[in-house]
Amino acid sequence: MIKIQTQLCGDVEELQAFMRPEVVSGCDVAVLFALGFPPDSLIPVAKTVAPGVPVFLADCYGIVGFSPAAGRNIELMEAGRGREYGGVGGDGGKGLVAVVFSGGGVVADTDALPPAGAVAHMVVAKAGSDVSSFLAQQATAFYYGGLAKAAYRYVPLEERFEAIPYFFVSTLAVAENPVGATSFTADVKGAVGTLLSQMPAGSRPAAVALFPCFMRGRNEYGINNVEPDAVSALLPGTPVYGMFCHGELGPRRCLGFDSVEKPQQSCTLHSMTTIVAIHAANSA
């Protein structure tokens, strides 16, 4: 069964405390969403993960995650982001969201997607990359994610982060770990509620991925945390992770869980949209 552990941390020291041995030991992949932290500052964190385990990093316009300090799911957006398109702009902040996948059932790569056997792909790509054409050729399951400022993978032998165009974390077809996805531009609770209503019997939500356009959040609502709060109201106690995007990758509509629709018809690159994916786990 896939286990997802995630947290929004205020600084590198808090991130290191979260990435303790009992969290990263035996993990399958670690993903870091960073706002306001250069890659070099995160090398000590990446070194805590076993050399054979992929560690990916996204340099973000903003981040979404569960903050122990705030006791809730929150969002942070870089100062002024969105004013270039007429928005009020983000009000600043720094943070790091760590997402650690363990227990088997996921594969991660930068060059290829599984030719078969996957039920969903999380995709993070550098804005301006050719990720859309790549997905059109290789995706065999629906995808969710978005475009960041930059994407990196950690190179253990060289102790550095290497810039890459994109990375993927694919969930494999394991019965205990269904994944569902939808997209919305309005009615957050309605969209997420519809997806929840399709969750397989005997399952519970384990984590929620949230990938909104950076023209949403404060630029859409005038205040922060509207969408994280709406998700939390429906799924109390469930952690959220993700980032604000400059182009959102995901379904055109609600796909339910473990959809078998061809992603070339069911998914696309969006704008001014929020993508939601719910990871479910067996309730037993």
Model-based region annotation:
Residues M1-A284:
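Hydrophobic alpha/beta core scaffold segments
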